[in-house]
Amino acid sequence: MNAKSPILVLIAGASGSGKTTFANEIVARIPQNTTSVIICQDSYYISNSQLNKNERRLINYDHPSSFEWDLMREQLSDIKKRKKIKVPIYDYKTEIRLDKTIDISDVDVIVFEGIYAIYDDVINQIADLKVFIETPKDECLIRRILRDVNERNRSFESVITQWRSTVSPMYDQFVEPSKKNANVSVLWNEHNRVALHLINKWINNIH
């Protein structure tokens, strides 16, 4: 087992900004002899299985209070110590947490991505690099519509309603202000390979 402490990279930004794509691109460039994992913050949505489907649809999933922060902090702290963690699995279609989990242990690079990835002081303190993805809001909306309709069993109308009522306001109130915690802000699109190269070079140099 590698005795060196794992590298924790946090990637934040608006819904639909390209956080997951950016995280995947980073991990794809990590050398094969270096173990890595991507953990999605959405896994830590509070389980609301006691509510019916209509009640769950009324929840503001874009507010910080929708996440189980204590578990999130505990597990990220443990994986930084190379301890085994059991990451919850959140089902977007049913909007509840599943009974099964994903076991993760002893990895060299942890990439944690989510809208509030750099929002929490405790998590920020144990992170090695904090990245904020900046993408125009109209592009984020287009990506979210395509994703939620095609992958999450949502209607076009419901996506637009949620964007106007919670996604955009919560971004302005909570997500965008967290940008001040970032070490790096990235203007992200599929052509911005320079940012990927620089971040991966940094990871490889300190690992």
From Swiss-Prot:
Superkingdom per UniProt: Bacteria
* Gene Ontology cellular component list: cytoplasm
One of its GO biological process terms is: UMP salvage
Give the record's pathway. Pyrimidine metabolism; CTP biosynthesis via salvage pathway; CTP from cytidine: step 1/3; Pyrimidine metabolism; UMP biosynthesis via salvage pathway; UMP from uridine: step 1/1
| UniProt entry keywords in alphabetical sequence | ATP-binding, Cytoplasm, Kinase, Nucleotide-binding, Transferase
Q: Which SUPFAM superfamilies match?
A: P-loop containing nucleoside triphosphate hydrolases (SSF52540)
Coiled-coil residue windows: none
Q: Does the keyword Hydrolase apply?
A: no
Residues the record lists as binding ATP: 13-20
What is catalysed by this protein? uridine + ATP = UMP + ADP + H(+); cytidine + ATP = CMP + ADP + H(+)
Q: Which GO terms describe its molecular function?
A: ATP binding; cytidine kinase activity; uridine kinase activity
Return the EC number.
2.7.1.48
Compartments, as annotated in UniProt: Cytoplasm
Say where the protein is mainly found: cytoplasm
Instruction: Enumerate the HAMAP family for this protein.
Output: Uridine_kinase (MF_00551)
Family per record = Belongs to the uridine kinase family.
- What is the protein named? Uridine kinase
Q: Which organism is it from?
A: Ureaplasma urealyticum serovar 10 (strain ATCC 33699 / Western)
